Amino acid sequence: MSKSDLNLLVENIKFEHLSVFHDFILSVLNTLSISDFELSVILCDNVYIQKLNNKFRNKNEPTDVLSFNYNELNEGLVGGINYKIQGDLIISFEYLKFSAQEFNVEIYEELQRVTIHGILHLMGHNHETNDFQKEGMLILQENVLRKNKRVF
């Protein structure tokens, strides 16, 4: 039996576009052929994500996105990629303000990019570098973004 459960939460920030963001995530999951999922996405500030980054990765600094995979049995695994997602994404909206400026993109575009990035990690995709021209995961990320990009 497949599940489709998506929860969006906001911690310590104001975010007024949950409906658009929710629809975007469902569209991304559909594009990636994921119909069986239990996914929670928490949008937060740097303090919140830094605590988690320190606790689980021993890095006492904020980051853009953390992904936590709870599908330990790897149900839905096909060719090393998991098409059944059970996990959490934690995204620092505050951090994205800086990275959006650094990459000269709009903050909501960066939010969409890191959301896709986190979902791809939950599926089992990985990358060695941040080379958007050569890394398969990052190429896929940008293709999925082009197909699903929303205006907030």
UniProtKB/Swiss-Prot annotation:
Disulfide bonds: none annotated. The keyword Nucleotide-binding does not apply. Signal peptide: none annotated. SUPFAM superfamilies: Metalloproteases ('zincins'), catalytic domain. It is found in: Cytoplasm. GO terms for cellular component: cytoplasm. It holds the Pfam family YbeY. InterPro entries: MetalPrtase_cat_dom_sf_prd (IPR023091), YbeY (IPR002036), YbeY_CS (IPR020549). Zn(2+) binds at residues 117, 121, 127. Its cofactor is Zn(2+). It comes from the Bacteria. It is an enzyme of class 3 (hydrolase). The keyword Chaperone does not apply. Belongs to the endoribonuclease YbeY family. This is Endoribonuclease YbeY.
